[in-house]
Amino acid sequence: MPIISRIGSKSWKVRLVYFTISLLLTLGAVTMLYPLMLMLAGSARSEADTDSIKPYPQFWFDDVVLFQKYVESKHRGDLEKVERAWAKRIGSWRRIARPDDDTTYLADFLAWRDKCEWWYLGHWDAWRLLAINGRAFRQQLHERFNGDIFAFRDEMGVPLKSWTKVGPPNPQLHQRYPLERVGMVGAFADFARTRPTRDRVLFNPDGHFWSKYLLPKYGTIEQYNEAHGTEHTSYRQVFLSRFVPENELEREAWETFVRTELFLGHIRLSPDLRDAYQRELAKKYGQRIEEYNKVHPGRDYTSFDQTPLPTSLPERRDEWVDWEDFIKNHEACPAEGIEVHGPRQQFESFVAQRRGVALETVTPIRLPIAAADWRDCMHNSGHLRWEFTTRNYKYVLDYILHHGNGIRNTIIYCVLAVGLALLVNPLAAYALSSSFALFEALSDGGWRGIARKVSASKTTKLEYV
């Protein structure tokens, strides 16, 4: 029977009471759900959107925030790497906006970038969490070694105790020498070639030149213009030229950076420097060709006149130091014999050939890396939103599954708890009811009373239990 009768419920006062109760219950539910939604939204945040306090992930509906998280993920959560790739000052993830780069050569760039040989894979590590490519690489190794961490350790030479510690090797960006592709480095290089081209981060020597040399020395573009007598509006108009500039200050900056900082794979030497290279080798090894042969196994030269000059980074690693020492020597290796041949120079040659024009008519071309990143992000927005929503959960689940026996122990505990509850409780209830009947029978006539009770309650006892 209801507390309020049907007749009473027709009164507007009663209806107002109903409405008030419903409103209070709804508000109570909201006060419980809103913090839960904030917590769930927070579980999908990263450094790029950590300031967002909303009951839903902001990147679900905001393309700019999605792009910020995309750039953060692609560049391993390192803002300096983004600035070097884009060759521009950013300062904060929240300041990243839709690029306003010139898209004249964007289509050419998208057609060329899979031919570029200088890149590393992105989307694998950010803020101590493995991103999609990092998780895929770990899974590939896990399947390759059938989950045997000891077999993995023996072959790769990495002393790790758990699969949760397995991840891609650090690429050590902007070092002078390329990494030797053995062990984990080789395995990751093979894996990287199987991933989409859009996940590649291209090396940008112009950005490296700006961040490593120009920015620390001159600071603002106004100070650079004052020193060089130029009228650039930003550092994006300053390039690392293919050949040494004629301007004295520009020449000094170019030589310092190219000779001491630039990745050796981006340097080409003129064949005319062969005699100078041979003289430098003879001087370095004390005019003793046998010493040179000893340092370079497999060589059997009888004179330094037989030693070749590699015009690009030698294939043999034991020749790299000799080659670099020669480049650093201002007297032996004149700057006019050095050429920079990096991704931009390769792209400029591609554009000139594709359009059938002279190279001089298109140079220099600023690599539209930021514009390509925006295009890739927008073309894969659905996949990226799902990845950023579930990434943290996937990482935690992967950690639990591959770290100890937590899942197995939990399953065993749950099975035993449920099984014992279903088995012990009925048995205890049956035993309790039997004890009660026995006590009642004893108090009602001893063993004869027991016999009467058993006969009378033969069926009802089962129902009771």
Locations of regions flagged by a protein language model:
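A short amphipathic helical element positioned immediately N-terminal to and/or at the very start
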Residues: 2-9, 388-400
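Helix-boundary and loop/linker segments of multi-pass membrane transporters
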Residues: 10-15, 74, 395-403, 436-440, ...
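N-terminal signal-anchor/first transmembrane alpha helix
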Residues: 1-44, 428, 441-460, 464
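Polysaccharide-binding and catalytic clefts of secreted carbohydrate-active enzymes
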Residues: 54-395
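Transmembrane alpha-helix signature in integral membrane proteins
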Residues: 401-434
